[in-house]
């Protein structure tokens, strides 16, 4: 049976996958089929805010909740799930960063190029905290084993 931290980390992973898919597809949509932009009018600022608020920020909040729920030590599979979530964020935002120069200037606005960098930094922070939690939990288990001897 899985505990609450594992379920929340799985939720974070699911949101990260959804965010990655939405961001990559949205940025490719802004490039357009022939590189001239989308064939229909779209408000890129509104769509980007919607994508971030539906899946990007909730993924980060759920990851932070997992760290808050861990009292003394982290479970190995929970931290591995969080590291996978962070890797998905980092890799997908690296792909988005490579797509940004191809976007038509008519659809370009100030935050369009900054958002991927924010989520790369967030992914690095999640991976670092998860690795720290994993290392701390190993040390915690060792000290308990030493006390039982």
Task: Show where each model-derived region lies.
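Alpha-helical membrane-associated segments of multi-pass integral membrane proteins
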Residues: 5-12, 103-147
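Loop-to-transmembrane helix junctions at the membrane interface
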Residues: 64-89
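Membrane-helix interface motif
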Residues: 22-36, 95-104
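Transmembrane alpha-helix entry/boundary detector in multi-pass membrane proteins
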Residues: 7-14, 30-56, 80, 112-119
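Hydrophobic alpha-helical membrane-insertion segments
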Residues: 13-21, 81-93
């Amino acid at each position: 049976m899985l505990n609450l931290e594992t379920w929340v980390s799985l939720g974070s992973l699911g949101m990260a996958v959804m965010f990655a898919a939405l961001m990559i597809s949205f940025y490719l949509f802004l490039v357009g089929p022939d590189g001239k932009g989308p064939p229909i009018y779209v408000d890129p600022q509104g769509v980007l805010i919607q994508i971030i608020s539906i899946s990007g920020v909730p993924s980060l909040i759920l990851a932070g909740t997992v760290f808050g729920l861990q009292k003394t030590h982290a479970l190995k599979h929970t931290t591995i799930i969080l590291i996978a979530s962070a890797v998905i964020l980092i890799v997908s935002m690296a792909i988005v960063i490579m797509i940004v120069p191809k976007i038509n200037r008519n659809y370009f606005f100030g935050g369009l190029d900054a958002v991927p960098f924010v989520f790369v930094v967030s992914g690095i922070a999640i991976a670092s905290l998860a690795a720290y939690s994993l290392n701390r939990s190993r040390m915690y288990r060792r000290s308990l084993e030493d006390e039982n001897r």
